Amino acid sequence: MLRFVSSQTCRYSSRGLLKTSLLKNASTVKIVGRGLATTGTDNFLSTSNATYIDEMYQAWQKDPSSVHVSWDAYFKNMSNPKIPATKAFQAPPSISNFPQGTEAAPLGTAMTGSVDENVSIHLKVQLLCRAYQVRGHLKAHIDPLGISFGSNKNNPVPPELTLDYYGFSKHDLDKEINLGPGILPRFARDGKSKMSLKEIVDHLEKLYCSSYGVQYTHIPSKQKCDWLRERIEIPEPYQYTVDQKRQILDRLTWATSFESFLSTKFPNDKRFGLEGLESVVPGIKTLVDRSVELGVEDIVLGMAHRGRLNVLSNVVRKPNESIFSEFKGSSARDDIEGSGDVKYHLGMNYQRPTTSGKYVNLSLVANPSHLESQDPVVLGRTRALLHAKNDLKEKTKALGVLLHGDAAFAGQGVVYETMGFLTLPEYSTGGTIHVITNNQIGFTTDPRFARSTPYPSDLAKAIDAPIFHVNANDVEAVTFIFNLAAEWRHKFHTDAIIDVVGWRKHGHNETDQPSFTQPLMYKKIAKQKSVIDVYTEKLISEGTFSKKDIDEHKKWVWNLFEDAFEKAKDYVPSQREWLTAAWEGFKSPKELATEILPHEPTNVPESTLKELGKVLSSWPEGFEVHKNLKRILKNRGKSIETGEGIDWATGEALAFGTLVLDGQNVRVSGEDVERGTFSQRHAVLHDQQSEAIYTPLSTLNNEKADFTIANSSLSEYGVMGFEYGYSLTSPDYLVMWEAQFGDFANTAQVIIDQFIAGGEQKWKQRSGLVLSLPHGYDGQGPEHSSGRLERFLQLANEDPRYFPSEEKLQRQHQDCNFQVVYPTTPANLFHILRRQQHRQFRKPLALFFSKQLLRHPLARSSLSEFTEGGFQWIIEDIEHGKSIGTKEETKRLVLLSGQVYTALHKRRESLGDKTTAFLKIEQLHPFPFAQLRDSLNSYPNLEEIVWCQEEPLNMGSWAYTEPRLHTTLKETDKYKDFKVRYCGRNPSGAVAAGSKSLHLAEEDAFLKDVFQQS
């Protein structure tokens, strides 16, 4: 970024930015960059060079003599209106001694005469230093195997990092160079202002090409780049005391011994060990310690299977006897609820002390084998913790840490979706630490077949994150990098990437044979020393510890593992161990399976609703609302005041508002949710003159809760996962994710299948997340018609074969894995949303809603429906005794769910049919067995029962409802042998017809079938 416009240099405002003027003439100007003299915009105008130029310019402003004479002339020329930008930069004559094929800039009027050899050398050394800053990581010794990274036959040393490139020879190595801007300025201390060329190169090699390499020059912020240089471009970036080395050794010993112990005791079990990357454990523990020192109170970790058990044991502090009991199989007891999961998927929540004496809450979220799917869940949990701690401004008290595999980080799209939350106002977590456990292989696939970039971490350049590559065999370098990443995140509240390059001792799991596919790689691995052996030899050789001391410590650690192994056979795991988040005062899943909890009321006093109506229909004085929206808002207020004609959006707003007044936080998220895809919600008002915003519900006076509504990025997988994670943190959050159209929710199918449907049964992970899914066949084609109701119902855990006992009926909601509803009235929507929060447990809710019913006259409620009663599982026909006969006169009963009711109502009205009644099933799962049985018994003279749906036969509710309907009929007084007749669209591969005319023809056909029209 070029920032040359200032009060001191106002001339740049009239001439345009320096970068702009140079770009215009780039085709004709030959420019000397920081390495290669080129024609055009190759080097001089790149982002990284711009930062360098900015640095030179600021130094020149303070003291023109502090920069090279060529820079002094250049900046003077740019300040001179008589000299065109194309002539501003003039290279000294002797700079032309560049490698063949390059060309120096032509001389102009700005500089005349000769420049001595020292000037040329100084400028070339500046270019050399910059080349190390930009490309030094390509030469760094970050690969312990020497096969993928660093300089080797496949990756030759970049020419810009060689002395020959600048025309230097061995005779130049002893020449003294002035230190200053562009040449190791932080080494100019203690009276030392010069250094030989050899010393400079040696320092550059140590700083940028040792066991770690840093990519940061892609970051446009000079402040951030300078901050990093202050920490890595210094004589000794890190030096550890004896006590610090003892701590590193101890942590590495525990990590290494853990894998060795499991390998000895359970040689044939899968554990997805961390061998070859054990230094990650002391790295993470350093990250935890430093972050806590800087104010972090909660750390949420997400990772896949590789090394998970080691992290659980050594970082989160899960008892080793608990882990060993899982290997033995002794934890599969009758008193442990849920189906459980394999040991390398389980999560944990634990509070433990750190080296500073402060405590930290560590949470490792449970995860499936769908790699990276836990990433957005972790960030959602972290954001919710920041909210709970009233820290959404500073974002210092909670931290998300994600561990990725190298293949998954580069290959899984949800990684990018998750990183995209970084600066979004309602999704930012103040920066995430990403740790790539890079074993240079993905199952059996080499990196060259798994990604199109040199590093797996290159994706992170999109968010201007620094990328630290570090050799896993150098545990001190690893520890330094993790510490640096913690400080970066605290300072700048942005992401940092740590790419720990190591190897994988075994195959994908311990029973796999990797030499089938990577024979040469595994020959190298067979010769590798373990990380702890490398570090032990270093400590012994430098005299820090004796071999005897180290061996005794290893033995002590091993004996502690043996003790835990003995205790494992009698170990009884506590319920709290598995919980990702502990909800104090809430019933556990085990208690829900045995107790019957009362149904709490969801109705609200009329006075409260009318006060809310005033809030919803007003705005600040001087705020200019769109003229069309004024009418809509006033009608909302009027409907509440008169108590009649309350529409869908108003019913929803009343639910949100009353929950906030009850002390429940409400968060609504998704694409375009502020206005609503169908222009129905208008939760956020925009001033038509200033574009200032006003959110009526956020003005409600309750210190305990607030209302948040946020348009999300155009992502389903990432955002749904984020909101799921948000919902895990506290039961006092109503979190609702809304799809733009229900059809697009399946982009997040992994979150639905692996987390929402099975999270509680597998991991005791409780959530009250609401999925709001627009659904309904309106002739808009196969991409805008269906939220895939059938898929949610297929995931339902209820047994359709048996009518529930009385006890089971009372506990239906407690036993279900999630709920599926398709309400048709604003009042029922109001009660279902309030019911989510007004009970002593939480269950996810798939809430299907009709686009057509948002404004339909048949979808209106009166205020009394909000002040009395509650959610209705089924709604009987309100036309009995009006436009149709009584229940006794009814011959045909049509069961249905959702907006097909409006088409049926219209057809019945046109036919003048008096003997057909409709019964709307508002809640599909748990199924209303008892309510439906009682309703059927109230119709004494039915001749047929029909199920009608607008979806095709192989979609919608039919496959789910058919067995349950027949189970229910067997419990009725008169209809035990009845068969329900299906009326709906024929089976189809596509969701819906693409043309309106075909849509209407299909609808007409099944409506005729319902009423037996010829």
UniProtKB/Swiss-Prot annotation:
Binding site for Mg(2+): D406, N439, I441
Oligomeric and partner information: Component of the 2-oxoglutarate dehydrogenase complex (OGDC), also called alpha-ketoglutarate dehydrogenase (KGDH) complex. The copmplex is composed of the catalytic subunits OGDH (2-oxoglutarate dehydrogenase KGD1; also called E1 subunit), DLST (dihydrolipoamide succinyltransferase KGD2; also called E2 subunit) and DLD (dihydrolipoamide dehydrogenase LPD1; also called E3 subunit), and the assembly factor KGD4.
One GO BP: cellular respiration
Subcellular location: Mitochondrion; Mitochondrion matrix; Mitochondrion matrix, Mitochondrion nucleoid
Name by which UniProt lists this protein: 2-oxoglutarate dehydrogenase, mitochondrial
Additional comment: Present with 14300 molecules/cell in log phase SD medium.
The keyword Transcription is annotated on this UniProt entry: no
Classification via PANTHER family: 2-OXOADIPATE DEHYDROGENASE COMPLEX COMPONENT E1 (PTHR23152:SF4), 2-OXOGLUTARATE DEHYDROGENASE (PTHR23152)
The entry's keywords: Magnesium, Metal-binding, Mitochondrion, Mitochondrion nucleoid, Oxidoreductase, Thiamine pyrophosphate, Transit peptide, Tricarboxylic acid cycle
Classification via Pfam families: 2-oxogl_dehyd_N, E1_dh, OxoGdeHyase_C, Transket_pyr
